[in-house]
Amino acid sequence: MRITQDVFQKMRDDGEKIAIVTCYDASFAALLERAGVDILLVGDSLGNVIQGEETTLPVTLDDMIYHTLCVKRGASTAFIMTDMPFGTSQVSPEETFRNAAELMAAGANMVKIEGGSVMAETVEFLTQRGIPVCAHIGLTPQSVNQLGGYKVQGKTDYEAEQLLEDAVALEQAGAGMLLMEVVPAALAAQVTRTLSIPTIGIGAGKDCSAQVLVLYDMLGIYSGKKARFMKNFLTGAGSIEEAVQNYTRAVKTGEFPGPEHTF
């Protein structure tokens, strides 16, 4: 039986950390599930690591449907979260619902939508109609052109206050989880204390309810500059499955992320 969203709320309430890894195919879905990963994120990062694009912007809804179907076939119990790609959640709540419904039909248990309080109306529209939503704030890769590149968000007092306001608005709109990407650890901790829903961090410190890494980054498969929040868990492991087990254990015990992975 597949894990449901309420399990993660209880884990958050009990102080139990949640381990998340991106996943794009059936074989890795089965492996990640065996290794104890709680949530499989079908990320639009597939544009970077699978398609070879510089950004996630070219990824289409059909791409996300295809990879969600693949992951669903490989995982029997793990919770599946799927990104809504660029252009599929920005036009109107009604159009977003139609697109999200296709992802849910493909096997997603929750969709992830990038954007702050401007997306609150859309989040509310979806959640009131049975589609669970994870909101995504901080560094939102789909807005990389507007943000001026991949850099830390929430560094100034004004930016930090805005992100906190965004987080509260999105929870009030019905978001079941909130992902924060590349924000100062102290700010992520403040948001986590303020909200009652699970928070997910990537480059956001150890105080979030959950941690997520891109599968390829976790296995040391990357080119170019290594991001600060990355850690190669394959180093010293005897197999890929053992590497994932080491990651899951490090998240659950609070060993990862360390100070060297945060801002």
Curated annotation (Swiss-Prot):
Gene Ontology molecular-function annotations: 3-methyl-2-oxobutanoate hydroxymethyltransferase activity; magnesium ion binding
Coiled-coil boundaries: none
- Quote the record's cofactor note: Binds 1 Mg(2+) ion per subunit.
The entry marks the following residues as binding Mg(2+), namely D44, D83, E114
Keyword Cytoplasm assigned to the entry: answer is yes
- Do you know which CDD domains this protein is assigned to? KPHMT-like
Q: What domain of life is recorded for the organism?
A: Bacteria
What does the entry list as the binding residues for 3-methyl-2-oxobutanoate? D44, S45, D83, K112
Q: Where is the protein found, in the record's own terms?
A: Cytoplasm
- Catalytic activity, EC: 2.1.2.11
Output the GO biological process annotations, alphabetical, semicolon-separated: pantothenate biosynthetic process
Gene3D superfamilies registered for this protein in UniProt: Phosphoenolpyruvate-binding domains
What is one GO cellular-component annotation here?
cytoplasm
* Active-site residue numbers: E181
Q: Which Pfam families match?
A: Pantoate_transf
Required co-factor(s) are: Mg(2+)
Pathway given in the UniProt record:
Cofactor biosynthesis; (R)-pantothenate biosynthesis; (R)-pantoate from 3-methyl-2-oxobutanoate: step 1/2
Catalytic activity annotated for this protein? 3-methyl-2-oxobutanoate + (6R)-5,10-methylene-5,6,7,8-tetrahydrofolate + H2O = 2-dehydropantoate + (6S)-5,6,7,8-tetrahydrofolate
The alphabetical list of record keywords is: Cytoplasm, Magnesium, Metal-binding, Pantothenate biosynthesis, Transferase
Query: Belongs to which family?
Result: Belongs to the PanB family.
Subunit structure as annotated in this protein's UniProt entry: Homodecamer; pentamer of dimers.
Q: Which HAMAP family match?
A: PanB
What is this protein for, i.e. what is its function?
Answer: Catalyzes the reversible reaction in which hydroxymethyl group from 5,10-methylenetetrahydrofolate is transferred onto alpha-ketoisovalerate to form ketopantoate.
Q: Which PANTHER family match?
A: 3-METHYL-2-OXOBUTANOATE HYDROXYMETHYLTRANSFERASE
Q: What protein name applies here?
A: 3-methyl-2-oxobutanoate hydroxymethyltransferase
The beginning of the lineage is: Bacteria, Pseudomonadati, Pseudomonadota, Betaproteobacteria, Nitrosomonadales
